[in-house]
From Swiss-Prot:
Subunit structure: Interacts with mouse, bovine and human coagulation factor X (F10) (activated). Interacts with host elastase.
Keywords: Disulfide bond, Protease inhibitor, Secreted, Serine protease inhibitor, Signal
Protein name: Simukunin
Residues in BPTI/Kunitz inhibitor domain copies: 24-74
Length: 102
């Protein structure tokens, strides 16, 4: 049995996994272009996701379209995700007043 293909696959998988984990430790990078896309980056020192403006090209992987995406990917204390509570929909119409002429 040739173990080389299995070893190569394992090393590629391991490298990919480590690269995925390390994006959270990269510094914020606005990129070199001048667009203003609102994005979020993870700041390890405060274990929080913060807003910044991305220029639209280059930069690094520590860039998320939403704060929730950043939190789910990087933040250690994930309980800080706030869920919006929906107000219950009114499904009944208000009662129609009945006038009695007795």
């Amino acid at each position: 049995m040739n173990i080389l293909p299995i070893s190569a696959f394992f090393l590629l998988y391991l490298g990919h996994s480590l690269a995925q984990e390390n994006v959270c430790n990269l510094p914020v990078d606005e990129g070199v272009c001048r667009a203003l896309f609102k994005r979020f980056y993870y700041e390890p020192a405060t274990d929080s996701c913060k807003e910044f403006y991305y220029g639209g090209c280059e930069g690094n992987g520590n860039r998320f379209k939403s704060k929730k995406e950043c939190i789910l990917k990087c933040q250690k204390n994930k309980q800080l995700i706030k869920t919006r509570k929906r107000k219950p929909k009114k499904t009944t119409k208000p009662p129609i007043p009945i006038i009695s002429l007795d």
